[in-house]
Every structure is written in C-alpha cells, then in structure tokens.
Amino acid sequence: MAPSKWDDEEESTSPPPVAYRRKFDDEEEEDVLDSWDAAEDSEVEREKAAKAAEAKAKAEAEAAAKKKSKAQRIQEHKEERKKREEEDSSSESEEDEAERRARLRRTEKDSDLKHAEDLFGDIDLNRTRNRGAPKAVVVSDSADPTQAVDLSAMPLFKPTTKDQFTRLTTTLAPLLTAHSKKPQYALWAQEFTKQLVKELNSGDVKKIASALTTMSNEKMREERAADKGNKKSKAAKTKVSLVTSRENKIDASYDDDDGLDDDDFM
C-alpha cells in the first residue's frame, strides 16, 4: 500500500496546469496600434498647423503691403523701374539709340500702368485706356484726294504733359479765334465747349464753368467802362458845341447892335 500513498502525494503536489490569458501580449499589441494612430494624428496636426502658419504669414504680408503709404509704393516702383532699365541696358548694349528710347518708353508706360493698378485697385484700365485713345482723324485735300493727313498720328495731338497741352493751345487758339467775328462763331463755340468737357466729371466741368463766368464778368466790366468813356466823350463834345454856338450867337448880336437907334439920326 505504500506505493499508492506516494502516488497520491505526487498527484496532490502536481496540480494540473492552468491556461492563462496572454494579457501582456494583447496589451502590448494594442499599445503599438494606439501609438501608430497617435503618430498619424500628430503628423496631420503638424501639417494643419504648418498650413495655418503659412496662411497667417501670407495674410500678414498682404496686410503689411496694403498698409504701405503711397510714397513708399511710388518709391518701390521707381526702384523696380530703375533696376529693370539697368538689366535691359546691360543685356541689350548693342541696340541703337532709337530702339533704346522706344524700349524705355515702353518700360515707363508699363511701370505707370502697374503703379495705377496698385493705387486704384480693380479699375478696368484696359477699358479706360481704349476709351481715351484718339481715333484716326484723316484730313484730305478736296482738290487732290490722294493727299491726306492723319492728324491723330501727329505728336502735337498726343499731349501728355502740361507743356505739351500748352503748345496745343497756342497752336489751335489763333487758328480758331481768327473767325470770332463771324456770325456763327458764338454758337459754334458753345457746341465746341460742350464736346471738350463731355468726358470730364461734374467737378471739373464746374471749375471750367466758374472760369468762364469770371471771364464773362471781366468782359462786362470792360464793356461798361468803354460805354461810360464813350458817353463822357460824347457829352463833352456836345457841351463844347453848345458853348461854341452860344458864343457865336452872342457875337452876332453885338455885330448887329452898334449902340445907335434909328431916332439918333433925326
């Protein structure tokens, strides 16, 4: 019976193995998945933050550009124009004088248009520029129709500066005012003035009307002074004529009266 006792003790001291859940393995796998998700989320957040920072910097730069004064923008355009001219001159040193002047005019015109767009915003400058462009005005000789001149192509009729407008005035005014004594001149001048101010705004038209009113008042004063002078001269002439006539009448009466009556001879 002894062996059976040892067998019982051996069986009692060796309990059957218990199957444990792999808790740590499962938890480690879940932790790895969570860390991957967190890494992806952080990468997305970093991209969003970078985009937001870039957009903010761009907005701040645009706001700073808008806050620049007019003088600063003009100075920047001048510097840009000068830099572009220097680059063009270095790259096109072999061009002749006429080509260089034409290029400089184009460069200056483009810079001025860019400057205007910067100052005035979304105004349709192309539409405004085309509207202000002069149409072809061709004058032909009735005796020889083949002889024609396009006035709009002449530099005189393309003024841009104050001196050029003054030259245009001094050229045209004598040609037009030479007909001021003709009966239809005043009516033509009214219609001509309307056409001249047709494209101006109301403020500029008001200034021109005020200048014409001032000229009208000056003309009235001159005419009144001239009429007054004529009346004084006429009155003086009339007075002298009356005095002369009276003196002649008095002298005639003395000549007829010798101081003797007819009875003195009796």
Curated annotation (Swiss-Prot):
Swiss-Prot/TrEMBL keywords: Coiled coil, Cytoplasm, Initiation factor, Protein biosynthesis
Gene3D superfamilies: Eukaryotic translation initiation factor 3 like domains
Any single GO CC term annotated in Swiss-Prot or TrEMBL for this entry: eukaryotic 48S preinitiation complex
InterPro entries, per the entry: eIF3-like_dom_sf, eIF3j
Region (Disordered): 1-142, 215-243
Annotated Acidic residues bias: 26-44, 87-97
Compositional bias (Basic and acidic residues): 45-65, 73-86, 98-118, 218-230
Pfam family, one: eIF3_subunit
Example GO biological process: formation of cytoplasmic translation initiation complex
Location in the cell: Cytoplasm
Single GO MF descriptor: translation initiation factor activity
Coiled coil regions, renumbered to chain: 40-99
Subunit structure: Component of the eukaryotic translation initiation factor 3 (eIF-3) complex.
Task of the protein: Component of the eukaryotic translation initiation factor 3 (eIF-3) complex, which is involved in protein synthesis of a specialized repertoire of mRNAs and, together with other initiation factors, stimulates binding of mRNA and methionyl-tRNAi to the 40S ribosome. The eIF-3 complex specifically targets and initiates translation of a subset of mRNAs involved in cell proliferation.
Record-stated family: Belongs to the eIF-3 subunit J family.
Identification of the protein by name: Eukaryotic translation initiation factor 3 subunit J
Organism: Aspergillus terreus (strain NIH 2624 / FGSC A1156)
Taxonomy of the source species: Eukaryota, Fungi, Dikarya, Ascomycota, Pezizomycotina
Gene: hcr1
